[in-house]
Design a protein with these regions (language model features):
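Structured adenosyl-cofactor binding patch, chiefly the S-adenosyl-L-methionine
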Residues: 98, 139-140, 154, 159-166, ...
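Glycine- and other small-residue-rich loops at beta-strand/loop junctions that grip anionic moieties
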Residues: 6, 29, 122-123, 148-149, ...
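Short, aromatic/basic amphipathic alpha-helical patches
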Residues: 60-72, 242
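Active-site/ligand-binding-proximal alpha/beta "capping" segment
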Residues: 193-258
Length: 285
């Protein structure tokens, strides 16, 4: 890694960092902080540029990261603290930021690994919730994650931080049409299971998109088979279009008076029930 010293906010590389941070170059991601950049190195993503300050070299962890970066073929820049503050997305920068290639997967990549357990995020709007769901999906042994159209970007700064780097490791197919996802899942015999708000009687039927389906308690469902678990947006749940395509609907029992769970919390409960049924047999991706 060749390193240049930069003290001006008008430097072209500094401007490029700011453009990428603002989302102007979709094929690149802006990463900030020691942990995310360590995760990116471990995940094997391609680095375009790395920027750091003297503060990074003041800690043992920072020195270890610098040592790892010596073997990364990319452009390096030693910034003044003032210039780092100009490109940083956080109030208290840790002294390191990077531009890396955005991971790129399609739905076939996500569904290729067997036995399949895939998460589908349907129109989630909160980046923190999506990032936490990605992190939980990886921890519970999911093969990958799919987002439907109108879902927040899983690689946005807040999503990436909430995922604790999982979004750089877990295959994610982004922004797909619900019907395309359903057709490909059915073609591969992957059952679509959508989380739902519970009806008054957990075994009663509900009408959804002109179809009558049973809503079962999540512990009654067989998660050992190939499944795609669908979680909907925070306020309204799984969209009607997506729930109408689901093979089964499930819910989490709750005490009276409780309207709903946070989608990340609901995801953790259901994903770990699936992992339990699968004997916590986590396959290495």
């Amino acid at each position: 890694m060749l390193v240049e010293k930069i003290t001006s906010r008008q430097n072209p590389l500094v401007k490029r960092f700011r453009r990428v941070r603002a989302g102007a170059e979709h094929h690149l991601l802006f990463l900030e902080g020691t942990r995310l950049i360590e995760d990116a190195i471990e995940a094997g993503v391609h680095f375009e540029s790395i920027a750091f300050t003297s503060a990074l070299e003041a800690t043992a962890r920072g020195l270890s990261l610098m040592d790892s970066l010596q073997n990364v073929p990319c452009r390096g820049a030693h910034l003044s603290q003032q210039v780092m503050e100009a490109i940083a997305d956080t109030d208290s920068p840790q002294g390191v930021a990077a531009l890396v290639n955005r991971p790129s997967y399609d739905i076939e990549d996500v569904l290729a690994v067997e036995p399949q357990m895939v998460v589908i995020a349907d129109q989630l709007q909160d980046p923190g919730n999506l990032g936490t769901l990605v992190r939980t999906a990886e921890a519970a042994g999911a093969n990958g994650l799919i987002t439907t159209r109108y879902t927040v970007d899983p690689y946005n700064h807040k999503s990436l931080r909430a995922s604790m780097g999982a979004a750089l490791r877990l295959p994610i197919a982004n922004g797909l049409a619900a019907r395309e996802v359903a057709e490909l899942c059915k073609k591969r015999n992957v059952k679509l299971i959508a989380s739902s708000a519970a009806p008054p009687d957990p075994r009663s039927t509900i009408e959804d998109a002109a179809l009558v389906k049973i809503v079962r308690t999540f512990t009654e469902v067989n998660f050992k088979r190939p499944v795609a678990l669908i979680f909907g947006r925070e306020a309204s749940g799984v969209s009607q279009d997506v729930s109408s395509l689901a093979d089964e609907l499930i819910h989490i029992p709750m005490a009276p008076g409780v309207e709903s769970l946070n989608v990340a919390a609901a995801g953790a409960i259901i994903l770990y029930e699936a992992a339990r049924q699968r004997g916590f047999d986590f396959k290495q991706r």
